Amino acid sequence: MGKKINPLGFRLGANQSHRSIWFAQSKSYSRGLQEDEKIRDCIQHYVEKNTRISSGFEGKGISHIEIQKKIDLIQVIIYMGSPNSLMEGRTRGIDELQTNVQKEFLSVNRRLNIAIIRVAKPYAQPTILAEHIALQLKNRVSFRKAMKSAIELTEQADTKGIQIQIAGRIDGKEIARVEWIREGRVPLQTIRAKIDYCSYTVRTIYGILGIKIWIFLDEK
């Protein structure tokens, strides 16, 4: 039976870096992981809630969240396609987000600092593309049309290849199946190939669908 490794973990130290940077003793390690998960979930829910009003998809979502922890400071860096979409009509957008996250994990001894960085090529980010596909699937667009539109967006970002996989009750069929499409090269077994990856779930009226995206960015 084939064993598939996570493409990001496979390339750690070569061309990928950790997205949580901290050290903890073995007894408190699980608590640190749970804290990271709470921070990411809180930020994700806040962004979804406050950017839902904007019409159309323009690569506005979160690419990834990096968390750096020190003794007295938690530094959270949010990489977004369009930070302005979060700040539209909100004079204290980051401060409000920071307050919400601070309330979530109630850390008195450590300060929380949140920074938002704009991603240069949002359509080269698999998470943003997965959100784009998920939005179309929720609106009952054909899965093939949704995948092809995502491929067209990646062509604007000068990527070398992309592979998209959707699994579940596609188009409301009774039997779950897996559909995928590939454009260009996606060398998953080449460590020097810089490949970005995400796994995303979307809840539709027919059930939950799983979306996986691999993007081949460059080769070093």
From Swiss-Prot:
Assign the protein's first listed, main location to one coarse class: plastid
For biological process, the GO terms are: translation
Q: Cross-referenced Gene3D superfamilies, in alphabetical order?
A: 3.30.300.20, Ribosomal protein S3, C-terminal domain
Tell me one Pfam family matched here. Ribosomal_S3_C
GO CC annotations, alphabetized: chloroplast; cytosolic small ribosomal subunit
| Coiled-coil ranges from the UniProt annotation | none
Query: Residue ranges of the KH type-2 domain?
Result: 43-120
* Keyword Ribonucleoprotein included in the entry's annotation: yes
Q: Where in the cell does this protein reside?
A: Plastid, Chloroplast
Q: Which GO terms describe its molecular function?
A: rRNA binding; structural constituent of ribosome
Q: Which UniProt keywords apply?
A: Chloroplast, Plastid, Ribonucleoprotein, Ribosomal protein, RNA-binding, rRNA-binding
Q: Does the keyword Transferase apply?
A: no
Q: Which InterPro entries match?
A: KH_dom-like_a/b, KH_sf_prok-type, Ribosomal_S3_C_sf, Ribosomal_uS3_bac-typ, Ribosomal_uS3_C, Ribosomal_uS3_CS
Q: How does it assemble?
A: Part of the 30S ribosomal subunit.
UniProt xrefs under PANTHER family: 30S/40S RIBOSOMAL PROTEIN S3, SMALL RIBOSOMAL SUBUNIT PROTEIN US3C
What NCBIfam families has UniProt attached to this entry? rpsC_bact
Q: Which family does it belong to?
A: Belongs to the universal ribosomal protein uS3 family.
Protein name according to UniProt: Small ribosomal subunit protein uS3c
Name the species this protein comes from: Piper cenocladum
